[in-house]
Amino acid sequence: NNYYNNLPTKTYDFSERHMEYATSRTFLNGVKNPNTTTREVGSGGNEFYAIPYLTNGSGAINESEMPFENNEDKISISKIQNKTVTSQVFDTVSFEASDSEENKNIIKNHVKTYGSVAVGIHGAQINSEYYNSSTGAIYCDDADNARCDHAVSIVGWDDNYSITNFNAKHRPTNNGAWIIKNSWGTSVGKNGFMYVSYEDVNIYLQTYGIVKSSDQINYENIYQYDYCGANGTFETDGLNGSPIYLANIFDKKTSGTEYITQVGIYSTEGYTCKVYVNPNGTGKNKSDLKAVKLKTGDSQTFDMVGYHTLEFLNPIRINADSFVVAIEITGSDSDKVSYATELQWDDEWADVEIESGKCFVTTKRFE
């Protein structure tokens, strides 16, 4: 990142309140937000809400457009609408839930190269014997009763951070700690920062980062069905080295001239992807689909789990009222591949809207 490379940096102040409300369901007078789960304001959140918010065009917006207020009142849904989105997230990463040296090094490299990593800790331990208030050091070894319930950010690390800094009742075996930034003000920890042992049982369970983003919005429309993001996984086996194909049919939103410039996908494993487009209608046969040249060439490979954007070398004009986008996926296992979907589940995903005849998967390239 720019700070690490001693380059000019820019500080952004995005609206937490907008994310809180834009990812919630019920507004004033019982009005429902159609593009989210059943989550309500004040009920907490996690990456399953935050990452789709940043990748589906809902946000982020500047703090000045919807400033923080210390309340959870019902508001008019108009308060979250027609805001100026000021950031676009292209690629994210989900790290392994592992305390291996390899995974720790991957996280360190991400912090050094791209910036902070979102993680979870057991927040209640701040008032428990897992925390040393004099040093701001946290080490939890209770995997059964002290689970993740609070989100923080890894902003650095200290391989030599001594075990003597931790509460004497619960100390890790080895030195070393992540430096985390909390959201509880400067009076907690060391001016708002804390040290979490590399051996903490929660620190690797929910780890996510942003790989590529921009403060320039270079699109007018996003075509999508999965506003709530990836919440389920399917697997196709017996492939014997063959890829699978995912396709969506979209209806053009305007009567004006539009071009497709990029396609997004969530990878559940290592993928190599190729993109095909039919800009002339809803046909999905091989003869209908045109191979797209990407900025990376004929294909693009992703090694890490997460949301990814495949950028076109040249824009493709939409010539009909409907069009098709298809992605060919080759997974890391030659015999099977998993892929993510947005599913209608009980509880928070019970109201997810699923449209029939719009999304397809096949192993035969729609022949």
Set out the residue ranges of the language-model regions.
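Alpha-helical support elements that line or immediately flank enzyme active sites
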Residues: N1-P8
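Predominantly the structural core of cysteine protease catalytic domains
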Residues: N2, D13, H18-A177, K181, ...
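Short, intrinsically disordered low-complexity segments
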Residues: T38, S78, V292-L294, D335, ...
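Short, surface-exposed secondary-structure junctions/capping segments
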Residues: Y204-Q216, T309-F312, E355-R365
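Low-complexity, Pro/Ser/Thr- and charge-rich linker/hinge segments at domain boundaries
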Residues: E220-Q224, D346-E367
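Aromatic- and Gly/Pro-enriched, solvent-exposed loop/edge beta-strand patches characteristic
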Residues: G270-E355
